[in-house]
From Swiss-Prot:
This is Hydrogenase maturation factor HypC. NCBIfam families: hypC_hupF (TIGR00074). SUPFAM superfamilies: HupF/HypC-like. InterPro entries: Hydgase_assmbl_chp_CS (IPR019812), Hydrogenase_HupF/HypC (IPR001109). It comes from Azotobacter chroococcum mcd 1. It holds the Pfam family HupF_HypC. The lineage of its organism: Bacteria, Pseudomonadati, Pseudomonadota, Gammaproteobacteria, Pseudomonadales.
Length: 84
């Protein structure tokens, strides 16, 4: 099962790609679907694509909920593989 997870933008590479922190690892992701991204923004990541921006509070709530459900590690592993 693939989950979309919140990730933090660490570096903007160009209009289509950025580096995000996924479970403590830095991975290049596709951000072509979003406008006006800045370093520090949080996005929803699914199969290597940033789909939507969200605020930090919502990102933290979502990550905490996934961790509580025991699915965060699985989602991060899937995202790390997809973002390569």
């Amino acid at each position: 099962m693939c989950l979309a997870i919140p990730v933090r933008i660490e570096e903007l590479l160009d209009e289509q790609s950025a580096v995000a922190c996924i479970g403590g690892l830095r991975k290049t992701i596709n951000v072509a679907l979003l406008d006006d991204l800045k370093v520090g923004d949080y996005v929803i990541l699914h199969v290597g694509f940033a789909l939507q921006k969200l605020d930090e509070a919502e990102a933290r709530r979502t990550l905490a909920l996934l961790a509580e459900l025991g699915q965060l590690a699985e989602a991060e592993q899937a995202a790390q593989g997809d973002a390569s």
